[in-house]
């Protein structure tokens, strides 16, 4: 199973590198923004096409990396009794890959929202430039500007929700990690009890004695209650 782990680890690193390259390409769409008013619709349309292509590719890679992390977690959990799986470095690697995935998700959403806002403004400016002499279309452009401001508020709310979701995912990951540790402890105790029958026998005797003491205590309490009730009646 260690071979499977190494294969998944290499695949995770390769996917992370691909996401990193795509994020650079996405951020370049913002860096290449004109920032002025001499923008034509053809240029904006081309940039929007590139934006859709890059975001689709990044979302696919993030989903792929999520599945790889889940597979790594399953492999480590299934082999919690193996010596290599108990190595602290394995748990550190799992935690590090989850942190990288979470960081990539945050960075992608931030870059996506920024580029989307820039492209929407450029589209508005390009429409305004072409229809500057048309008062009806100018009024429509002002309506678009109000829409963009409202969209900025919505995006701000989305970012707050993303932060809350990230906190929830972090809590889920911590619980999953604790579950793996508990399964490992349970497995080791099971192996110890099989390896050392004397310990297993001692645990069984302790359990039997506790049950016997519980029965004796229950009998004494019942007798006292019966005697008390009988004494009250008479």
From Swiss-Prot:
Gene Ontology CC annotations of this record: cis-Golgi network; Golgi medial cisterna; Golgi membrane; SNARE complex
UniProt membrane topology term: Single-pass type IV membrane protein
Disruption phenotype: Reduction in brood size at adulthood. Abnormal tail structure, and loss of the T-cell derived rays, R7-R9, of the male-specific sensory rays, but ray sensory function remains intact. Combined with ykt-6 knock-down causes reduced seam cell leading to loss of ray phenotype. At cellular level, reduced expression of Golgi-resident proteins like mannosidase II, and more so in combination with ykt-6 knock-down.
Main location: Golgi
InterPro entries according to UniProt: Golgi_SNAP_su1 (IPR023601)
GO molecular-function terms, A-Z: SNAP receptor activity
TM helices/strands, residue ranges: 213-233
Domain of life per record: Eukaryota
Keywords carried by this UniProt record: Coiled coil, ER-Golgi transport, Golgi apparatus, Membrane, Protein transport, Receptor, Transmembrane, Transmembrane helix, Transport
Pfam family, one: V-SNARE_C
GO biological process, any: inter-Golgi cisterna vesicle-mediated transport
Cytoplasmic topological domain: 1-212
Coiled coil: 54-121
Vesicular side: 234
Localization of this protein: Golgi apparatus membrane
Protein function: Involved in transport from the ER to the Golgi apparatus as well as in intra-Golgi transport. It belongs to a super-family of proteins called t-SNAREs or soluble NSF (N-ethylmaleimide-sensitive factor) attachment protein receptor. Cooperates with ykt-6 for proper expression of Golgi-resident proteins. Required along with ykt-6 for normal embryonic development, seam cell division or differentiation, and ray formation.
Description of how the protein assembles with itself and partners: Component of several multiprotein Golgi SNARE complexes.
Family indicated by similarity: Belongs to the GOSR1 family.
Protein known as: Golgi SNAP receptor complex member 1
Gene responsible for this protein: gos-28
């Amino acid at each position: 199973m260690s071979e499977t782990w190494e294969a998944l680890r290499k695949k995770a690193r390769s996917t992370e590198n691909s996401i990193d390259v795509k994020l650079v390409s996405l951020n370049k769409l913002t860096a290449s923004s004109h920032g002025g008013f001499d923008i034509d619709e053809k240029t904006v349309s081309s940039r929007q096409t590139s934006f859709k292509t890059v975001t689709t590719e990044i979302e696919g890679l993030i989903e792929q990396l999520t599945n790889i992390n889940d597979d790594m977690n399953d492999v480590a959990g299934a082999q919690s009794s193996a010596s290599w799986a108990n190595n602290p470095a394995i748990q550190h690697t799992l935690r590090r890959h989850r942190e990288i995935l979470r960081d990539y998700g945050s960075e992608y959403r931030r870059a996506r929202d920024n580029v989307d806002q820039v492209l929407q403004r450029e589209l508005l400016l390009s429409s305004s430039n072409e229809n500057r002499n048309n008062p009806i279309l100018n009024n429509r452009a002002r309506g678009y500007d109000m829409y963009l401001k409202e969209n900025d508020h919505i995006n701000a709310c989305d970012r707050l929700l993303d932060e809350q979701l990230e906190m929830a995912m972090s809590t889920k990951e911590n619980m999953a990690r604790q579950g793996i540790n508990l399964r490992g402890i349970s497995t080791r105790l099971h192996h110890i009890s099989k390896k050392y029958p004397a310990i297993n026998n001692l645990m069984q005797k302790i359990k039997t004695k506790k049950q016997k003491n519980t029965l004796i205590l229950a009998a004494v309490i019942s007798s006292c209650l019966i005697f008390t009730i009988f004494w009250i009646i008479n």
